[in-house]
UniProtKB/Swiss-Prot annotation:
Highest taxon listed in the record's lineage: Archaea
Record's keyword annotation contains Nucleotide-binding: yes
BP term (GO), one: DNA replication
Lineage: Archaea, Methanobacteriati, Methanobacteriota, Stenosarchaea group, Halobacteria
Swiss-Prot/TrEMBL keywords: ATP-binding, DNA replication, Nucleotide-binding
Pfam families linked to this entry: AAA_22, Cdc6_C, Cdc6_lid
Similarity-based family: Belongs to the CDC6/cdc18 family.
Protein name (Swiss-Prot/TrEMBL): ORC1-type DNA replication protein 7
ATP-binding in keyword set: yes
Length: 403
């Protein structure tokens, strides 16, 4: 008897529920697609491409729509002899400067054995190398910069590339930039010259509502799961949870996928609403754990100080209670402590991530107003993460509780 056999009850093609799956059609984004197509039309006409800026929360279709439309654009422009279209797609998640973006663009355009070092060049020299590569390719070149908000305020490249031809750096290439951002504030913080250049065309992707998410799930389920594995109530619940929380198709698909995994693990043939609730809880726990692990060193120190107070049953706690512990733990870990106000910012970050609950108290003229903090997640979850903080000298009351 085989140890492993194929799934014949839940998943027909589970890859269709994964983040990297690209559907053949796009659901519930008709207006955005129409606007996007109009912005791309000059390319079909053989004209200089427009620069396009897409923004909206994670999971609302920005990248999926871009991949879908640009694939169609490449196919449809093949029939025109005077249009030579090239695409270069760069995810900027781990890039924090124009210099790093330029280096990575050069290395995407060059053969693997001819790539440049990520350090050691003046920025203008890297830009010049990039222009040489673009001119060597020639024709219309769309540079898609996904997660572009990660470069922060160092946005010079977002002006340099669109203006390279008019400034005499390019003669054979007609570049256009498509910037994709999850951060609503990124556009507002761009320098005026970059804003005027990059935001030539702006497209806002709003969160999905429950009916839209339901339509997306129904379309995916047709190929991803067996007919009897999931019913309308389960799909509607996944859509409703995601719509009320983030409006993200990615979240709705993740909940459905995790629900299927739970059912499969339990040896059950159908998904139930109970599976959906379990899936939501598991995904939220995973997200919280990831958020805690990704904190800065001082975020970790603030987390440990709060955990000590919680174990000693001293929460909810004010900043005046947390700061002395934070300072002691930092000094014991050979880390220079922040001033109280900056440390308070890290508590606020923990609250924003849903790790801490924050409540404002107002005691009138005598006591003033202040915040109190306590954990919004289980201390066992926090302890599992803190246990891996090797560079922090944990207080005895914390160390004994989590070992």
């Amino acid at each position: 008897m085989a140890t492993f056999t194929r799934d014949t009850e839940i998943f027909r093609n589970e890859d269709m529920l994964r983040e990297d799956y690209q559907p053949d059609s796009i659901t519930a984004r008709e207006d955005e697609i129409s606007t996007y197509m109009a912005a791309l039309q000059p390319i079909v006409n053989g004209a200089q491409p427009r620069n396009i800026f897409l923004y909206g929360k994670t999971g609302v279709g920005k990248t999926a729509v871009s991949r879908y439309l640009l694939k169609q654009l490449q196919r449809d422009t093949d029939q025109y002899d005077d249009v030579d279209l090239s695409l270069c797609w760069l995810n900027c998640t781990n890039l924090s400067s124009s210099y790093q973006v330029a280096v990575n663009l050069v290395n995407q355009l060059r053969p693997r054995d001819d790539r440049i070092s990520t350090t050691g060049y003046p920025q203008q020299r890297v830009f010049d190398i990039l222009y040489e590569e673009l001119d060597q390719i020639g024709g219309t070149i769309l540079l898609v910069l996904d997660e572009i908000d990660h470069i922060g305020s160092d946005d010079e490249i977002l002006y340099e590339i669109p203006q390279a031809r008019s400034n005499g750096y390019l003669s054979e290439a007609k570049p256009g930039v498509i910037g994709i951002s999850n951060d609503f504030g990124f556009r507002d913080n761009l320098s005026p010259k970059v804003k005027d250049t990059l935001c030539e065309e702006e497209i806002h992707f709003s969160p999905y509502n429950a009916p839209e998410l339901r339509a997306i799930l129904e379309e995916r389920v047709t190929g991803a799961m067996y007919d009897d594995a999931v019913d309308d109530a389960v799909i509607a619940l996944c859509a409703a949870i995601a719509a009320q929380d983030t409006g993200s198709a990615r979240q709705a698909l993740d909940i459905l996928y995790k629900s299927g995994e739970i059912a499969r693990t339990n040896g059950e043939e159908r998904l139930t609403e109970d599976h959906v609730h379990q899936a939501r809880e598991k995904l939220e726990q995973s997200q919280v754990e990831h958020g805690m692990r990704e904190l800065t060193k001082h975020g970790h120190l603030a987390l440990v100080a709060m955990l000590q107070l919680a174990f000693e049953q001293e929460t909810p706690a004010r900043i005046r209670d947390v700061y002395p512990l934070y300072r002691r733990i930092a000094e014991g870990s050979n880390v220079d402590p922040l001033v109280r106000r900056r440390m308070h910012d890290h508590l606020a970050d923990l609250a924003m991530l849903g790790i801490l609950g924050r409540q404002m108290k107002n005691e009138g003229r005598a006591g003033g107003h202040y915040y109190q903090y306590e954990f919004d997640v289980g201390l066992d979850i926090v302890g599992d993460v803190v246990r891996d903080f090797d560079s922090i000298a944990l207080p005895t009351s914390v160390a004994t509780q989590i070992t």
